[in-house]
């Protein structure tokens, strides 16, 4: 059973009940706590746009605990983060792997954080294909382009040379929160709020 908790808030007009995610959204907090797919991307992008419309000056907080997922869905979130006027602060709580790590490092410079026991993992994109040789070749070219584009984003956002990124992403490259800070993926490790 996947129950979403509700909270009750006292107001001048009485009590008001919210699901926990709606209540957090009032505080400009968005949570990605699952694999990144089209449904998650649509929800996160809608929340980003809503919060921008509410106040284009205030930061938005994106909390990430995700094994990654679809690159197309991940890029939808990343592009929306870059599009909107408010800065997006990112925080890894648990795991930010694959595209989850890209979203973590895509936060505003100086505002990317991880909790002490977080784990961050970068790697090259995964893909599979079957079909005719031409279709396989087209897909292989697309995956190689994605690999280059992702490595460039990581290099640009971390300050690491692209050659190091290309080497490190050949396989799953896991980091602790402190190692991710040294690498340039996050700007700090948060012990207390």
From Swiss-Prot:
The active site is at residues 98, 123. Keywords: Cytoplasm, Hydrolase, Protease, Serine protease. Coiled coil: none annotated. GO terms for biological process: protein quality control for misfolded or incompletely synthesized proteins. Fourteen ClpP subunits assemble into 2 heptameric rings which stack back to back to give a disk-like structure with a central cavity, resembling the structure of eukaryotic proteasomes. Cleaves peptides in various proteins in a process that requires ATP hydrolysis. Has a chymotrypsin-like activity. Plays a major role in the degradation of misfolded proteins. One of its GO terms (cellular component) is cytoplasm. Belongs to the peptidase S14 family. This is ATP-dependent Clp protease proteolytic subunit 1. Its EC number is 3.4.21.92. PROSITE patterns: CLP_PROTEASE_HIS. NCBIfam families: clpP, PRK00277.1, PRK12553.1. InterPro entries: ClpP, ClpP/crotonase-like_dom_sf, ClpP/TepA, ClpP_His_AS. It comes from the Bacteria. It catalyses: Hydrolysis of proteins to small peptides in the presence of ATP and magnesium. alpha-casein is the usual test substrate. In the absence of ATP, only oligopeptides shorter than five residues are hydrolyzed (such as succinyl-Leu-Tyr-|-NHMec, and Leu-Tyr-Leu-|-Tyr-Trp, in which cleavage of the -Tyr-|-Leu- and -Tyr-|-Trp bonds also occurs). GO terms for molecular function: ATP-dependent peptidase activity; ATPase binding; serine-type endopeptidase activity. Pfam families: CLP_protease (PF00574). It is found in: Cytoplasm.
């Amino acid at each position: 059973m996947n129950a979403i908790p509700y909270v009750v808030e006292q107001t001048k007009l009485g009590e008001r009940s919210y699901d926990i995610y709606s209540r957090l959204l009032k505080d400009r907090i968005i949570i990605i706590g699952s694999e990144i797919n089209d449904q998650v991307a649509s929800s996160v992008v809608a929340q980003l746009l809503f919060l921008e419309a509410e106040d284009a000056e205030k930061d938005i907080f994106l909390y990430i605990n995700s094994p990654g997922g679809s690159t197309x869905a991940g890029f939808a979130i990343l592009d929306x983060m870059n599009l909107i006027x408010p800065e997006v602060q990112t925080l890894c709580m648990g795991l930010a792997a694959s595209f989850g790590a890209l979203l973590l490092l895509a936060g505003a410079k100086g505002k990317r954080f991880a909790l002490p026991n977080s784990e961050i993992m970068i790697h090259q994109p995964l893909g599979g294909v079957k079909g005719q040789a031409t279709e396989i070749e087209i897909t292989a070219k697309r995956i190689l382009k994605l690999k280059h584009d992702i490595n460039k984003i990581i290099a640009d956002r971390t300050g690491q040379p692209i050659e190091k990124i290309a080497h490190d992403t050949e396989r799953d490259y896991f980091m602790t929160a402190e190692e991710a800070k040294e690498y340039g993926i996050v700007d700090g490790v948060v012990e207390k709020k």
